[in-house]
């Protein structure tokens, strides 16, 4: 069986913790921030955990991070 290729875009966007959780950045934090309340932008700084329904798809994209 050939080697699996890592999806380079996914590799840059997702990090895997020591316990195997997949973490991601939150959306709506790249531009047009002046119209958003500071409370919202502050909460968008927090790293979020990927939902369990997406785990299988992301594991196929980044097979060697586990």
Swiss-Prot record:
InterPro entries on file: Ribosomal_bL35, Ribosomal_bL35-like, Ribosomal_bL35_CS, Ribosomal_bL35_sf
Top-level lineage group: Bacteria
BP GO terms, sorted: translation
GO cellular component: a single term: cytosolic large ribosomal subunit
The UniProt record lists the keyword Ribosomal protein: yes
Annotated GO MF terms: structural constituent of ribosome
Keywords, alphabetical: Ribonucleoprotein, Ribosomal protein
HAMAP family: Ribosomal_bL35
Annotated Pfam families: Ribosomal_L35p
The UniProt record lists the keyword Ribonucleoprotein: yes
Protein name: Large ribosomal subunit protein bL35
Family: Belongs to the bacterial ribosomal protein bL35 family.
């Amino acid at each position: 069986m050939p080697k699996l290729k890592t999806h380079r875009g996914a590799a840059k966007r997702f990090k895997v913790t020591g316990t195997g959780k997949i973490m991601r950045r939150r959306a709506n934090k790249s531009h047009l921030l002046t119209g958003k309340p500071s409370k919202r932008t502050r909460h968008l700084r927090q790293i979020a955990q990927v939902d369990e329904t997406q785990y299988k798809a992301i594991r196929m994209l980044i097979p060697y991070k586990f």
